[in-house]
Amino acid sequence: MVERRKIRTEKGLALVPGANKLSGGCNFAVEVPEGSQASLVLYKKRSRKPFVEIPFTQEERIGNMYALSIPDFQPEAYEYNFMVDGKVYIDPCAYRILGREKFGAAVDADIHKVRCGFLRNEAFDWEGDKEPSIPYHEMILYKLHVRGYTKTNRTVTGTKGTFQALEEMIPYWKELGINTIELMPAYEFMESGTCRDAEKEEMVSEKRTEGRVNFWGYIPGYYFAPKRSYCATDDPEKEFKTLIKKLHQAGIACIMEMYFPKECNMLVVLRALQFWKLYYHVDGFHLLGEGVPTEILMHDAILSNTRLMFHDFN
């Protein structure tokens, strides 16, 4: 492992959680419980072991946020995790989760196998994409589970149970008169193995669920990352964008169902919805759980024309 002192770092911006390219470098920020210690772990791509572990200093902490920046960082060459009090902690604001490509796979003994990737932000031709203008009272909504809907469908010729497979269903939905698709949780969540324990409200814990798989995803999730095991390709960003573009070309809107338990940071909830709207062109959200900050969302300028559905929605 490379010595920490050989990696030049600067004080980061705590306002932006996760890993984000900012002003010539990469900013890493993570929320931790009061009194906890944290560090950043970097991996070279295709390397099983950590490349370097960089402890956060007290100077890089404000409140319960740690933040540091690495100048001239090349994210395409690395992957990362955080460590909190000596335990690997997957960034809840990561744009990509690696190591969970197979749905329902048992947790690996290697604690460094599951790790975070960076937003590629590669050029994508939206072909003048426009969201379908469908009033609430005219919505004919079809709710589905990305994996379950096409996994046993004999008419699907591509990789079943994926975003790509849903593209093949568009003519069928058009025939039915469907104009809105609602996706059950399609962001990353740990359906088996070690996960964050929402019931105990711990930042980092190990809750073993051997032999059990949470098929539906109504648990704390990684709200910025399309679920990797729902992808036919190794590029979740492009695959999900392509699905949205083709839905819109057919005049079909896409609403994402998202579950936020009560311990969710309300600003992370807001930022997650803004991200899916701006980056993926999602048309709306069906929000579940006790952590939905309805007043904040309803008054947000970016989401002002976005379809928002939640408990007591009127």
Question: Can you say where each PLM-predicted feature lies in the sequence?
Answer:
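Conserved, mostly hydrophobic/aromatic
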Residues: 30, 144, 183, 223, ...
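Aromatic- and acidic-residue-enriched carbohydrate-binding clefts of CAZyme catalytic domains
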Residues: 155-162, 193-249, 260-280
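Hydrophobic faces of well-ordered beta-strands that scaffold small-molecule active sites
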Residues: 140-142, 181-183, 254-256, 285, ...
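Active-site-proximal helices and loops of the catalytic beta/alpha 8
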Residues: 54, 218, 272, 278-314
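The feature marks proteins involved in alpha-glucan
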Residues: 1-23, 53, 60-145, 150-157, ...
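Catalytic domains of carbohydrate-active enzymes, especially glycoside hydrolases
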Residues: 168-186
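Structural beta-strand segments of beta-rich domains
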Residues: 24-28
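Short proline/glycine-enriched turn/loop motifs at strand-loop junctions of beta-rich domains
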Residues: 31-37
